């Protein structure tokens, strides 16, 4: 490989790293809302998995404590799944056309 080719390759790698870092920052700021019990429990979290809001329909509080706990856990899990799906989708968009093997993890 010629010297210029290696320099170009390094430049492309640096540009990709900067692009991926920007996308990761955008994902961290993205908010998703997980739901359970047909929307009776809603949990909002960001891409860093920080929960910012929990909304509980008043009718759920009239039910038993165990049901409320189960619905809260389900809503949090739903929000986590949505964060992961959003992250995966954004990363796939960013690496589209790079011919990476399936499941390849970027080192940054």
From Swiss-Prot:
One of its GO terms (molecular function) is DNA binding. The keyword Mitochondrion does not apply. Coiled coil: none annotated. Gene3D superfamilies: Nucleoid-associated protein YbaB-like domain. Residues 84-93 have a biased composition (Basic and acidic residues). Keywords: Cytoplasm, DNA-binding. Residues 84-108 are annotated as: Disordered. The keyword Cytoplasm applies. GO terms for cellular component: bacterial nucleoid; cytosol. Pfam families: YbaB_DNA_bd (PF02575). It is found in: Cytoplasm, Nucleoid. Belongs to the YbaB/EbfC family. Binds to DNA and alters its conformation. May be involved in regulation of gene expression, nucleoid organization and DNA protection. Homodimer. This is Nucleoid-associated protein Csal_1459.
